[in-house]
Swiss-Prot record:
Annotated compartments: Cytoplasm
EC main group: transferase
UniProt keyword tRNA processing present: yes
Catalytic activities: guanosine(37) in tRNA + S-adenosyl-L-methionine = N(1)-methylguanosine(37) in tRNA + S-adenosyl-L-homocysteine + H(+)
Protein's name in the database: tRNA (guanine-N(1)-)-methyltransferase
Function, as annotated: Specifically methylates guanosine-37 in various tRNAs.
Keywords recorded for this protein, A-Z: Cytoplasm, Methyltransferase, S-adenosyl-L-methionine, Transferase, tRNA processing
Subunit structure: Homodimer.
InterPro entries: Alpha/beta_knot_MTases, tRNA_m1G_MeTrfase_C_sf, tRNA_m1G_MeTrfase_TrmD, tRNA_m1G_MTases_N, tRNA_MeTrfase_TRMD/TRM10
A single cellular component GO annotation: cytosol
CDD domains according to UniProt: TrmD-like
Species annotation: Hydrogenovibrio crunogenus (strain DSM 25203 / XCL-2) (Thiomicrospira crunogena)
Molecular function terms from GO: tRNA (guanine(37)-N1)-methyltransferase activity
């Protein structure tokens, strides 16, 4: 798995290779990672990457030429055109299922927009998919890109150190995760459910599934409804 990130602020991505699961996976060479600054592919002495939008309006837009040249450079280095993802408020929602789908691409290039966005011609001709991390606006695509990368890295075999860790995460089966407890067994008058202490694995799994259903129904009724519809459809077949 290789990630190439087009960004005006490459220093922001050092967090991925310096801490947590993504750092360990990087050190274990489970994925490759490189940042590309489109200013490198400008032709003027000011290294201009943005300009005013035609038709007027506030803000500036990232220009087509530097972005296209950056993708071309990535293509030359990788040896094939990567799957290009633009982090955009207009994109499809980033979900656990979407992360799994993206795993099918060995080379993923993430485009981090700034200002008021990027020239539509780049989106139409170069971008393969637009992805949104939520219905809110942030200053650029860097944080959304890091969220997407972290989510994908967790799915790489060996990244978490325990094969079932990713499988038990929230959303992996369409449900929220169940409650978890650790030592001490008693704290501030609160205990741990007896079923988790008895060591009966079948009962523990049943309890966890029931708790996942209950928690999803209470906290995310939209997911709960979708889960029921999916499993009812499967049973009908």
């Amino acid at each position: 798995m290789r990630f190439d990130v087009i960004t005006l602020f490459p220093e922001m991505f050092s967090a991925l290779t310096e801490s947590g699961v993504s750092r360990r996976a990087y050190q274990d060479q489970l994925y490759q990672f490189k940042t590309w600054n489109p200013r490198t592919y400008t032709t003027d002495r000011h290294k201009t990457v943005d300009d005013r939008p035609y038709g007027g309006g506030p803000g500036m837009l990232m220009m087509y030429p530097p972005l296209k040249k950056t993708v071309d450079a990535i293509t030359d280095e990788v040896g094939e055109k990567p799957y290009v993802v633009y982090l955009s408020p207009q994109g499809r929602p980033l979900t656990q299922q979407k992360l799994s789908e993206l795993q099918s691409h060995s080379n993923v290039t993430l485009v981090c927009g700034r200002y008021e966005g990027i020239d539509e011609r780049f989106i139409e001709t170069v971008v393969d998919e637009e992805i949104c991390v939520g219905d809110f606006i942030v200053s650029g695509g860097e944080l959304p890109a890091m969220m997407l990368m972290d989510g994908m890295i967790r799915l790489i075999p060996g990244a978490l150190g325990h094969n079932q860790s990713a499988e038990q995460d929230s959303f992996s089966d369409g449900l929220l995760d169940c409650p978890h407890y650790t030592r001490p067994v008693e704290v501030d008058g609160m205990g741990v459910p007896e079923v988790l202490q008895e060591g009966h694995h079948a009962k523990i799994e049943q309890w966890r599934h029931e708790q996942k259903l209950l928690r999803t129904k209470q906290k995310r009724p939209d997911l709960y409804t979708a889960y029921l519809a999916k499993h009812t459809e499967t049973q009908d077949k």
